[in-house]
Amino acid sequence: MNSLDFDRKPEDTRVVVAMSGGVDSSVVAGLLKREGYDVLGITLQLYDHGAAVHRAGSCCAGQDIDDARRVCETLGIPHYVLDYEARFRETVINPFAESYIAGETPIPCVACNQTVKFADLLATAKELGADALATGHYIRSRPSPKPRYQGQRALYRPTDAERDQSYFLFATTQEQIDYLRFPLGNLSKPETRALAEEMGLVVAKKADSQDICFVPQGKYSDIVSKLKPNAALGGEIVHLDGRVLGTHEGILHYTIGQRRGIGVATGEPLYVVYLDARSRRVIVGPKEALETRRVYLRDVNWLGDEEIDAAASRGFACFAKVRSTRQPAPAEMKCDADGIYVELVDGEAGVAPGQACALYSGTGEDARVYGGGFIRKSEREPAAEAALQALLQAPAAA
């Protein structure tokens, strides 16, 4: 077996590397070239919104394409640029805006992986006769430990927990996992940068890309209001107890769990508890009203060894991660008449619809990724949940 788990020599193995123009994917290309693989680099032109083309830390725009080209020249490998701007807008940017005006907190990086990188780009790699598509994600994959799943691969958290990107890859299907390779899974970020320096790559000291590449300066409201002008319609700011505390200029300016910049002063610390998109109300309350014990999932991608219905029916003990910055915490996947849900043993504050809930076998670097889903709705502690439901059923002021 070669280093990518193929039963042939590296020179007889063609690999397409998804090159963003950053240090991680550049090092992947360099490592594979060094090992003797037949390497092709592909960069996707995903968007162009003026200043971001040359903004430090942007991704998949003009400067990044040029950086990827220069890296490929240094390594002596072919480089191709594919224009996926229309596809990216259709499957990532527009749904992002729709999700925001629906009161959700979307994760466009997951959608990009699902619909562009691991779908369209993967198909292109196959058309080019590649045996695998390699990326610079910090995650690991290896052959499945179960004999009956021979030929399949499983996902695991990486060695560098601080760079763990498994949360954004929970939706990767089994077919995609079997074709993908992640050469950085056993490396730390400092080791990756050291390799880039050693290889003489121009991107060795380049800043890391931001999570949401198409949002200038991180202002979600700017792009949402541009795509959906009605999203800026105002409404009420309402306390969980029913008091109208003030008004706002659009729910797109708020997120669940937000405390600063709410726009009302009552002498008590208040947090955004819920965004009522239908009535354009921002519902606020005390911190304890954010505590969530149960989340219902949609679009579940299950990577476990048994059927999901069987696992959920009996209760599947696991660890769940509802934020990219959190460590996996004890949980149990179950189901009822309303669908698949996850019980968070220790609870979690500020869980919002649209976020991902990734599932794991544990918390360490050997933890297997069981997949996960998008949070459809969450349930709070009984008192807060009852107050919220009563408020949602009451008509908003005209």
From Swiss-Prot:
Cellular location of this protein? Cytoplasm
Residues reported to bind ATP: A18, M19, S20, G21, G22, V23, D24, S25, L44, G136
One GO term (biological process): tRNA wobble position uridine thiolation
UniProt KW ATP-binding keyword: yes
This protein is called: tRNA-specific 2-thiouridylase MnmA
Ranges where the record places region Interaction with tRNA: 163-165
Q: Source species, please?
A: Sinorhizobium fredii (strain NBRC 101917 / NGR234)
EC number of the protein: 2.8.1.13
> Where would you say this protein principally sits, based on its record?
cytoplasm
GO CC terms of this entry = cytoplasm
Primary role = Catalyzes the 2-thiolation of uridine at the wobble position (U34) of tRNA, leading to the formation of s(2)U34.
The reaction(s) catalysed by this protein are: S-sulfanyl-L-cysteinyl-[protein] + uridine(34) in tRNA + AH2 + ATP = 2-thiouridine(34) in tRNA + L-cysteinyl-[protein] + A + AMP + diphosphate + H(+)
Catalytic site: C112, C213
